[in-house]
Every structure is written in C-alpha cells, then in structure tokens.
Amino acid sequence: MPNIILFDNDVREKLLPLTFTRPNCELRVGILRIREKWEKHLNATASFITHDYLAGKYGIDYDDDNFFINGSVLPSPELVTLVKQMDYNEAFLQNDELIVARLDARQLERLMKDDAFEALKGIELEGTPFLKINQLTDLYRLNGEAIRQDIELLQKERNFVELPGSNFAKAKDQIFVEEGAEISGAYLNATEGPIYIGAQAKVMEGAMLRGPVAIGDHATVRMGAKIYGGTTIGRWCKAGGEIVESVLLEYANKRSEERRVG
C-alpha cells in the first residue's frame, strides 16, 4: 500500500486557534483523529506537510509511491475505494480543491520545492460522499455522523465488552464499550445513534448519554451529567452538567452543573 502524506492548506486559517499547535489532520472528529481514520482505512502510517514551525514534531516521510491527501477530508468507504484504484499522477478534485493525489517521490520532491512538475490528471469527484472540515463549526456539526462512521470502522478490528447490568440501556446493540471502562448506574439511549465508551473511561452513577456520543479513553463523565447526541468527550477529559453537540478535545474539563455547553 502506498505511503500516506496529509497536507495542510488554507483551511488551516479557519481552524485557528486549534491548528496553532497541530496540523488539520490531528483534529479529532467523532472517535478518531482524521489521521487515524486514514491510517486505518489504508493500513499505513501517515506523515505530514504543515507549517515550518510544526514540522519538527509533524515531519514528512515519503516513498516511491505516495497518497497526498487533504488533511481536512474525512475518509468514507466510497472515497477510500476510489483512492485505492488511483493511478500515478491522478488527482481527485472537488470544486477545484485538491482532495487526493497519487505521486511518486520525484513528483513529490518537485512539489515541496515549488518546482514545475508533470501535470496531473484531474478527476472531479461527483456524487462521492465524504465529510470535510472547512471551518470550526464543522467539528461539532459533522461530529454525530463521524461517530457513526468511526463505529463502523472500529467494529472490524475491536472486540467490545458487554455493558454491565447495573445500567439502563436502550438499543443495547448500539452501545460499544472498550475493555477497562467503568460504567455503573448510568442511562444510555442509543436509539438515535451509537454510544462509544473508551478504554479506562468512567461513567458515573446517574449520568445520561443519548447517542451518537463518544467518550474517549480515560475520560470521566460525572454523576448526573447529561450528554446529548453529536458530542465527543476527548481523552482524559472530565465532563459534568449538560453538554449538547460539542467536541471536547483532550484534557479539557467542563465540570459545572449550572452552565450548558453546546
């Protein structure tokens, strides 16, 4: 399988301040980061083309065969199928914006040096569904659908454990619990979308979750919290009170029960 390189473009400016410290593809939408989604779909490790001051941490690694992918694009099964069928020097476009290109090392080196390189065969993506982050509001607006897509992807590789019997659950077959999660005396309603509970996460007594919802590894949902659909609680977060259609990135806390987020 070709190497993966995820690149930033002008969309980065619309995702500030979050992209001051990371490439676009390191944003979490749904359960996984955009980079992680591509790595799982293409079974390869990704590297980055981003701003110079981030390159020390997020460097580039290229090979003789590379998928050059827009870092704000979320892979869908339909898009991934087309990507796997690409030939060298083909490029998929949407409204003249580059989505994916397949480049050899020589072409990629010329691109990075801003040298002239061989023309690519541009193919407009018409009727191919996929999600794309164009502005900050897309992170939560598209989050519910991204959770659904990630669950379909993770089901292929994970063995989830059964929800403990002390909880009240609706649509239990749409509740996905990683090993090591602690859930006791909670209310989980997955009739409108899946609920994902990550490894070592803790959902305390009286918490209410209405899917689609994702609780990241090591996160804590406090007693009596109300987590509504379209919400991701990131790794190591602590969440309390009422949270609606929101994305809490790693190590963010919302403990107050008096104020609503979302």
Question: How should these model regions be labeled?
Answer:
Residues 162-262:
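Structural signal for interior beta-strand "rungs" in well-ordered beta-sheet cores
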Residues 1-173, 180, 259:
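Terminal amphipathic alpha-helical/low-complexity segments used for targeting or macromolecular assembly
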